[in-house]
Amino acid sequence: KVHKALHQTTGMLLTTGPTGSGKTTTLYTMIDILNTPEVNISTVEDPIEYQIARVNQTQVKPEIGLTFADGLRTLVRQDPDIVMVGEIRDNETASLAINAALTGHLVLSTLHTNSAAGAVPRLLDMKVEPFLLVSTVNLVIAQRLVRKLSGIKEKYFLTKAGIAALGKSIDLNKTLAALVENKIVPKGTHWEKVPFYKPRTASDGTEGYEGRIGIYEVMGISSAIRDLVMRGATTSDIDKQARSEGMLTMLEDGIFKCAQGITTIEEVMRVVSE
């Protein structure tokens, strides 16, 4: 879905999540994929975290009056193909970003919301008209970072009670189908036979985690979701529709990574409920 959306030449891709959830890293990864000699890319950032070859990067300086909105206004006049805005923080930046997406640019940016569906009311709060929102936003990625297990871990299996408890938070059938489809578990596997892992305390007393990895939910803006936005639907209605169209929630993506031995159920639950 993400690669498909990146190959659109206009519209907007949003990454959402709290501070420190890796949104900027995701934006830089997208820029890296798109950064070919024939494409003109410009960014407005606060701060510039990485210098990227061939990309025209502008640092926001509010103390001299250079805000995201000012930077974006200047960039669009240079007619780049792709614009990255570090964050949409206010109504003016939202309006300019939407306008850039409407006038033949691919716009990448971030928002502070807890879920992919939450990006819709956030933009509406910033006075973006629903018809403009549905004509520009192509994709929303919500994300969090979870700690990764180190090599010191032990395998275990869920009890029936554990599976029932998990079923209150995720769609068990859909998540299991994704595990089978990606060949993490063989076809015909039941939840009782899906391996999970927990950290073993190492001899030096370290906790068994090292590094972090993203867990994601990726919501494409389908025609059904467009209709819901135009009708003023709630975040939960939009989320429900996206899930019915096959979106794995962040929690489901986290459980998917648990079954791969990358992280633990406890870690995913802790991060998602924060």
What are these regions (language model features)?
Residues 1-274:
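Short, flexible helix-loop junctions that flank or precede catalytic/ligand sites
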